[in-house]
Every structure is written in C-alpha cells, then in structure tokens.
C-alpha cells in the first residue's frame, strides 16, 4: 500500500518521498479517480507525518484542467512540489497551472540543454527545476540552468533515477547550487540480467 511503502522509505532513512498517486492517463480521469488520488496522498501524509517532505509526480498524465483540479485536491497535504502535472512542452498550460495552483510546480527531467529551461523561466511556468545531469547536457550545463533559475527565484531539485555514479555527480553539483532543495535518488537498481 502507499502507506506501507512510505513507512519503508522512512525506515531506510529517507527524509522525503515522491510518488505517483494517479491511474493511467488523462482519458481515465473522473471524480472517483480524484477521490482515490486524494486518499492515496492522505495515506502517505498520515504515514510520514508533517516533518517529512512529500512530492507528487504527475508524469505529464493530466490535461491542464484536470491538473488544476488535482492541485487543489493535494494542496491541503503540504506537498514539496507537484511534478509534471502536464508534459513540459505545453509551456503555456504549465504556466496557467502554476498561476492557479497554491503548491510549487516542478518539471525538467525531459528537457535537454538550457534553452527550454529558459523558456520555462521566462514564462514563469515553474517553481522547481528538475534538470537531470545525464539528460540536460552534463555538469556545466546543469550549473548554467541553476544559475538562470536562481535569477528567477526558482529552486533546484535535480532528477536522478539512474546509477550510483550519476548520484555522486549530482550530489557534487548540488553542493555548489545555492537554490538546491533536494536530490532525487533511486531506492533500487535493476539487476544485471535486466540489461541483457
């Protein structure tokens, strides 16, 4: 269950959790789905308490109107951020969601080089940048993205579901980013047989 999974992460020493409470794609959205999403978020908040960070990953599954509705539903639970409520290429929709939501909006794992990040920042479409050192162009490129973000009062929570090497690289980069808030890491790596 969501509750038990959250408790397991706490037992592992994590001080924040990120999860996806959504089902399928936007085509399956209904009021009942919205209530189930809210129940999952509530269960995790109950499990981790108020001192542990909680981020919600939308995986770009929602339409703008449904993302706005979901932002309202999860707002009372004190989330760190709502990641990719819509796909990042929909900049105007992301900006609209950010203006209406009362929770931080995050994106960036699917963006490459600093140029699309610049558009996000200029359109005021994001509160938290999730540049991925492996996807966005390497250490220097992510550092440049972070410098741009700082000028817009936007924080950094780098994306990283990869290997221990990319985790180490990301952590070194985090140490020099003034607006760094949290680093994503994976809790398990695929066994070598999965790579064959």
Please report, for each region that a protein language model flagged, where it lies by residue:
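Shared catalytic-loop signature of beta/alpha-barrel
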Residues: 72, 78-81, 89-196
